């Protein structure tokens, strides 16, 4: 199932998709119970925001936890030019048809991945507003361009 999910995500620009491999977890030295905190948040389907200076280990921690929980990790590098369409998806021309292509956030929501919005503070407010319904009790992603609302997979985590 994870391989099928990873295959669906191939070709997404600006994103890194990592499947949990069957070997050892990526090395991470737990400092102060953050792994237990993360697991508790995951079990309650609560979003987590990691804050710290560049190079302090946020990405490595998420790689470690995704492996430990057996979930794929979708990493989106946020920046000031990132649009909500870059996150949720867009309509594209394919031959003479117009087709919808899910963005990395939509794919993660549908398939139950852990989605890491790296450097989210760099993204514009009009882009980040799309994640608000995912961070509360609704756990939903509105796809305004399609007129749909996607309920998050039970294993999805932001």
Give, region by region, the residue ranges found by the protein language model:
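AAA+ P-loop NTPase catalytic core and its hallmark functional loops
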Residues: 1-158
């Amino acid at each position: 199932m994870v391989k099928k999910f990873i295959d669906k995500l191939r070709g997404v620009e600006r994103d890194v998709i990592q499947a949990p491999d069957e070997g050892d977890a990526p090395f991470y030295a737990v400092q102060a119970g953050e792994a237990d905190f993360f697991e508790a948040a995951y079990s309650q389907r609560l979003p987590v925001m990691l804050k710290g200076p560049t190079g302090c280990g946020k990405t490595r921690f998420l790689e470690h936890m995704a492996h430990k929980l057996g979930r794929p990790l979708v990493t989106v590098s946020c920046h000031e030019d990132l649009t909500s369409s870059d996150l949720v998806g867009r309509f594209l021309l394919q031959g003479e048809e117009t087709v919808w292509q899910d963005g990395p956030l939509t794919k993660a929501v549908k398939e139950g991945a852990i989605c890491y919005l790296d450097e989210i503070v760099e993204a514009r407010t009009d882009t980040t507003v799309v994640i608000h319904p995912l961070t509360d009790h609704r756990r939903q992603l509105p796809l305004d361009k399609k007129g749909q609302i996607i309920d998050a997979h039970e294993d999805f985590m932001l």
